[in-house]
Amino acid sequence: MKFTCIDSFCGAGGLALGLKRAGFEILVSFDASAPAVESFQRNVSPNCLHARAEDLTGRRLLSDAGFEGVPDLFAGGPPCQGFSRQKRGAHLGDARNGLVLEFVRLVSEIKPRFFLMENVEQLGKKRGKEFVDKLNAELAGYELHPFFFNCADYGLAQTRVRFVIVGKSRKIKAPFQLPAPTVKRWLTVGEALADMPEPPADSSVHPALPNHYRTKVTAINTQRFSFVPQGGGWRDIPEELRLKCHQRVDVRSGGWPDVYGRLRLDGQAPTITAGFDSFTRGRYGHPLQERALTPREAARLQGFPDDFHFCGTRRDVRSQVGNAVPPPLGEALGRAILKTLRNEQATYKPRV
């Protein structure tokens, strides 16, 4: 028996890859980014639409999937930059958060047995309460299971915390249980990158590994970074070499602790963002070399296999890697949902 899924706001395909590993058949996907769609089609499935959510309907998605009936899962991670840590005040009215409402609309139209929404940590906190309340009101036919995940608990060498809502149709009687951690000990950066060869010095792509290339660094930044030990940051740089803004900051204040940060081999990476290719944007410095992470290294820390080829410009690739749902997290969530669907099928009644 096949279990079916429609994947929305799919990006390069991290969530879909995890759901496929769990056992779902991905019927159709969509994203507004052409390079992300190209990556998805190359690595996950050719049936991926280059389209905006606002221009799609549930009927259109089911038609493009060639599917009649009720899909088992509607999944996605709609962007909502308005829920950033820096943003204050009301958030649901922020135009940047409109896509989460498009996600709700498509769930209402498609009426899947389950839905899965992955998003930023802040959406599940106080500033996201208005959205969660709206979700409860508009999707009253679903039993909601909101929770937070630390991706390190699911096999990543990264302490990425995400907010996830799983909605189960109230027609399903079998209980849903949140996925338990899949590892007893957190993977370290050193273990994750252990066999990774050094990227070419001229910033070209490594001949054996797609997307494995270094970002060019100025001589002064290379010199600054050479003083930073594993786990260190800008405060380890001699004062005469620091940026002027760092010279004016009291070291004891702890300002910008991750800028010029170097990863520890025996620790975990922070959240991988689209800025991972520069140690001036955060703790993305290689543990042993005077450079930032390559896209391939960042993709490993996100849980992607080495043969997953990200398409587009280097800027496109950064965005796809940093914005991806880690495949191991998608797989853990998919297995938990499938367990409920299989229990329903075996214990209660056949699907219709």
Tell where the protein language model's regions lie, with residue ranges.
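C-terminal target-recognition/interaction regions appended to catalytic cores
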Residues: H212-V352
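Conserved SAM/SAH-binding beta-strand->alpha-helix loop
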Residues: S33
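Class I SAM-dependent methyltransferase "Motif I" SAM/SAH-binding loop
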Residues: F9-A12
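Extreme N-terminal starter segment of soluble prokaryotic enzymes
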Residues: M1-C5
